[in-house]
Amino acid sequence: MALAFRRGHRRGLGWGIRSQEKDYYHDLLTRLGLGLQNRMTSKVGLLSGGQRQALTLLMATLQKPKLLLLDEHTAALDPQTAKKVLDLTREMVEEQKLTALMVTHNMRDAIQIGNRLIMMNDGQIIYDVAGEEKQNLTVEDLLEKFAQASGGAFANDRMLLSK
């Protein structure tokens, strides 16, 4: 976390983390609500997938990025942990007023999160929707739009099962 926090700053040969910084990191980790504040000396590889994703999200936002890129950041998580990570994502994006680009195959998440939805197929944008029209979309509507725009039926079970 200290490296992420100091991103873009000059580094010297001083002590790694001052106690003031350690307290700051402890407070940030406590806000995540995943018990990470008690595992500050644990190796990241020993954390659960959800804990790692939340920690990565926190580290990515320590220095306000111009663009927060989230590429399938909940794909390997169980539904409860995925919801927690998505809630943390929303909170951080809104609180820090970040611009975020979230790539997902979960159509429900694509509809519910963000202010714009862009659907792609074979590297091409086939559907772009925002505002009230996006808010009124359903997964079934999105599947129909995909079939119309791509000229074929939807063939990925993973996306269908995420309803």
Residue positions per predicted region:
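ABC ATPase C-loop
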Residues: 60-61
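Helix N-cap at the start of a conserved alpha-helix in ABC-type nucleotide-binding domains
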Residues: 79-81
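Helical segment within the ABC ATPase nucleotide-binding domain
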Residues: 83-96
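Conserved beta-strand-loop-alpha-helix hinge in the C-terminal portion
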Residues: 124-150
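Catalytic Walker B motif of ABC-type/P-loop ATPase nucleotide-binding domains
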Residues: 68-71
